[in-house]
């Protein structure tokens, strides 16, 4: 790897450690030319294939910004959004494919968001599933009630 300071084409790894619950490797490097040290983080590439066919890297930030819009005005904090984004990434990575359709990312968001905030879930689902009428909302609300009944036996 090139040194970010002097652009020397080689560097030596001094230390390697797993981070992000084993999803990344943090490497401490040293440049033989200028002697400066720097850190790199390596992760397995996860790509999202959009409907248009364009491929882009998976982005937790993009998941968070989409969900944040659905949570606008709701009592959902940044920690909860970060946890949701981590859950979505874990679900998508668990599929075992280096490329995943954007549709699968949306599906991976729905479950954790439903558990986090039902109103935000309905907002997100209405856009994601292209609701066209009040009947679509009624069906989704009924499914939420059924899920709640299964989740909390009473």
Curated annotation (Swiss-Prot):
Cofactor(s) the record lists? Zn(2+)
Cite the cofactor comment: Binds 1 zinc ion.
Protein task: Negatively regulates transcription of bacterial ribonucleotide reductase nrd genes and operons by binding to NrdR-boxes.
Q: Is tRNA-binding one of the keywords? A: no
Family classification:
Belongs to the NrdR family.
Domain ATP-cone as annotated: residue spans = 46-136
Q: What Pfam families does the database record attribute to this sequence?
A: ATP-cone, Zn_ribbon_NrdR
Would I find Transcription regulation among this entry's keywords?
yes
Superkingdom = Bacteria
Q: Name one GO biological process term.
A: negative regulation of DNA-templated transcription
What are the top taxonomic ranks of the organism? Bacteria, Bacillati, Actinomycetota, Actinomycetes, Mycobacteriales
NCBIfam families the UniProt entry points to: transcriptional regulator NrdR (TIGR00244)
- Return the protein name: Transcriptional repressor NrdR
Positions annotated as zinc finger (unnamed): 3-34
């Amino acid at each position: 790897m090139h040194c970010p300071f002097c652009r020397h084409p080689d560097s030596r790894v001094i230390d390697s450690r797993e981070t992000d619950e084993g999803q990344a490797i943090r490497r401490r490097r040293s440049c033989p030319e200028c002697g400066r040290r720097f850190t790199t983080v390596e992760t397995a590439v996860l790509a999202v294939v959009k409907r248009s066919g364009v491929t882009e890297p998976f982005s937790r930030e993009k998941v968070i910004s989409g969900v944040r819009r659905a949570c606008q005005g709701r009592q959902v904090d940044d920690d909860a959004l970060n946890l949701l984004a981590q859950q979505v990434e874990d679900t998508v990575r668990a599929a075992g494919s280096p490329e995943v359709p954007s549709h699968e990312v949306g599906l991976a968001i729905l479950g954790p968001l439903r558990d986090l905030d039902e109103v935000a879930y309905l907002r997100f689902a209405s856009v994601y599933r292209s609701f066209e009428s009040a009947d679509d909302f009624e069906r989704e609300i009924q499914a939420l009630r059924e899920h709640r009944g299964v989740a909390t036996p009473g």
